[in-house]
Amino acid sequence: VGSEMCIRDSQFLYSILAEEKCQEAGVEIAYYEFPTALTQTENGWQVDCMGFGTKRRVICKQIVDCTGGAEVVGLLGLERLRGEERQPGSYLFKIGDPHNPASSQLRRLYVHGADSTNSRTVTLANLTGRKTILSRVRNSKERLMHLQPETGFRESFRIIGDTVITVQDYTSGRHFEDAVSYAFYPVDLHTRTGVKPKPLKRGIVPTVPLSSLIPKGSKNIIVAGRCISSDRLANSALRVQAACMGMGQAAGATAALAAQNKTTPSSVPLDKIHGLLREHNAIVPEKS
């Protein structure tokens, strides 16, 4: 209590361990496939997906959209929100001495105007970032030691849910009646001149309500991650990994319960969601 701790992990090892857990649970992983059309059925959804050399039709009861920009929500024609101005993306890389790898520090390059709307805008952001990094490598005469595969995007489309989390909700640590997970990060809006995080006051722990994860007017779909229903400043804090993990676990539990009980995510009793989350060792919001 009263101290801060940063836990660093290996993104590469984490991804392999996550794959292992999914496969142990019977999940069929389908990399490189994307939904192209969705049809609502009497019992849920028909989802047509396509990848290179593959086509697949998935019949399911519930959808969890974790695409970052609410791409599935957009395919359904449900309302999404995005401002004209976007935070810069970041491209992570290392340049240094290959004979002294400890001397090379991870660097972050701002990619201004980075837009994750579609494949063409993502391609443009990646080309822009890599061009600048190549220029730095040439000028420094150092070795490029590491390069992330693509630009990291901070901001994209957000859904509009029955609850829109405001920055006041976030910074005051409002406990929503339908809270399903926690967040913790400072308000962290990046601009062309940099970023000045606004830390939360000691003891303030924001919550994420279920109603901010369900698109308004929808049925049998829930989201998790950066596309949560929130204003821009609140979203700048909610978009980070730990908060997204909590949302994902809550959304998955809600979707599973909805499928098992032949109901919709918004109709699942909150105590059932909390109970299932606790079974899987999630940290469940409680009123102080």
Question: Where do the model's predicted regions map?
Answer:
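Short, small-residue-biased leader/transition segments that mark boundaries at the very start
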Residues: 1-7
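Flavin (FAD/FMN)-binding glycine-rich loop and adjacent Rossmann-like elements that form
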Residues: 3, 15, 32, 50-62, ...
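Short beta-strand to alpha-helix junction loop
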Residues: 8-17
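N-terminal cofactor/phosphate-binding cores enriched in small/glycine residues
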Residues: 12, 22-23, 35
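A structural motif corresponding to the C-terminal end of an alpha-helix
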Residues: 21-28, 217-218
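Secondary-structure transition/hinge residues
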Residues: 26, 37, 256-260
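A conserved short coil-to-beta-strand element within the FAD-binding core of flavoproteins
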Residues: 31-45
